[in-house]
Regions:
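Positively charged n-region of N-terminal signal peptides that target proteins for export
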Residues: 1-6
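C-terminal motif of bacterial Sec signal peptides marking the signal peptidase cleavage site
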Residues: 16-20
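Binuclear metal-ion centers of metallo-dependent hydrolases, dominated by the metallo-beta-lactamase
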Residues: 23, 31, 130-182, 248, ...
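N-terminal, intrinsically disordered, polar/charged segments of Gram-positive cell-envelope systems
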Residues: 24-53
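Short acidic-hydrophobic surface loop/beta-edge motif
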Residues: 39-44, 64, 155-163, 188-190
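Active-site-proximal loop/helix segments of hydrolase catalytic cores
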Residues: 53-61, 67-69, 73-90, 100-117, ...
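Short acidic-glycine loop/turn motifs at beta-strand connectors
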Residues: 66-67, 192, 285-290
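Divalent cation-coordinating acidic motifs and surrounding scaffolds
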Residues: 127
Length: 297
């Protein structure tokens, strides 16, 4: 049974566990159903949810925040943490409630040590599988220095914070023979009222098929797996897109390492609006019923 963790309770009980410009409106979303705007349990209004997709080349980082909570999924490469911190400063974001590292490749964990060292990060969540590297060592040393709780998720887990629901789907195996780091990726669904955002890390075919088998619900926005790669998926991208039916898709790619043309075609033939971070950062805003998007030039 999926383990449900309430964010407030988690703040009190978490312990250190560490192992080894165009604008478009959309229609209604497909997340958990509410009537009207998002409300907290006490009836207060947490405000507009913003999801900022950083332009970091072929690297991932997504800052998710409203008036009451801040969540980050991945932290880009080493040297890119400063860009995230600058955005936080510019937008008066004082700290991070939850950091999720989808997997330990350098383009997802590289900037994490900088963030942890320079702003308050209350908790970090990771997969079980560790990919040894200098970036991992820097991350490990910094969380120990700051006494930041790190929890390796071993089962599907849900969180709530500031009216935001986070559902984390974990890999079925602790280690895979093929692409063990990519296929350890946490797949994270963020829901806000009737709207939802799906983040797939660098999941390859094996991992994506696991997730497809859960029959995921539709979402408003999907971050395409593995930087828009096509050859790693053996046709399952079609099935994935047919299930989640997003209005928007985001690909994290660079001018030097672009997404596959085949992936772009799969997205566009379905009428999905495609954003590529190599063309600029992307900001999504949700009021709990509708999603708006703008790409920064």
């Amino acid at each position: 049974m999926k383990k449900i963790i309430k964010f407030v309770a988690l703040m009190l009980t978490a312990c250190l566990i560490f192992t080894g410009c165009n604008e478009t409106d959309t229609g209604e979303g497909q997340g958990s159903k509410v009537t009207g705007a998002v409300q907290n349990h006490d009836g207060s209004d947490p405000g507009t949810l913003k999801v900022y997709c950083f332009e970091l080349g072929k690297a991932d980082s997504f800052l998710i925040y409203n008036n009451e909570a801040t969540i980050i999924i991945d932290a880009g490469e080493r040297g890119q943490g400063k860009d995230i911190l600058q955005y936080m400063e510019n937008n008066d974001i004082k700290g991070i409630d939850m950091m999720f590292i989808t997997h330990f490749d350098k383009d997802h964990v590289g900037g994490a040590a900088k963030l942890i060292g320079n702003t308050e990060v209350k908790e970090v969540y990771t997969p079980v599988y560790i990919k040894p590297s200098d970036d991992y060592d820097n991350f490990s040393e910094k969380v120990k220095e700051k006494k930041t709780p790190v929890i390796a998720l071993k089962e599907n887990t849900s969180f709530e914070a500031g009216g935001i629901k986070i559902d984390v789907n974990v890999a079925a195996k602790e280690i895979y023979e093929e692409s063990p780091s990519n296929n350890s990726s946490l797949i994270i669904r963020v829901s806000y009222g009737e709207t939802s955002f799906l983040f797939t890390g660098d999941a390859e075919s094996i991992r994506l098929k696991e997730y497809i088998a859960t029959k995921p619900e539709k979402c408003n926005v999907v971050k395409m797996p593995y930087h828009g790669n096509y050859t790693k998926f053996m046709g399952c991208l079609d099935e994935f897109l047919d299930l989640v039916q997003p209005e928007y898709a985001v690909i994290t790619s660079s001018k030097e390492e672009k997404e596959a043309d085949e992936t772009k075609e799969l997205i566009e033939k379905r009428g999905i609006k495609l954003f590529r971070t190599r063309k600029g950062s992307v900001l999504f805003e949700s009021d709990g019923k509708d999603v708006k998007a703008v790409q920064m030039s």
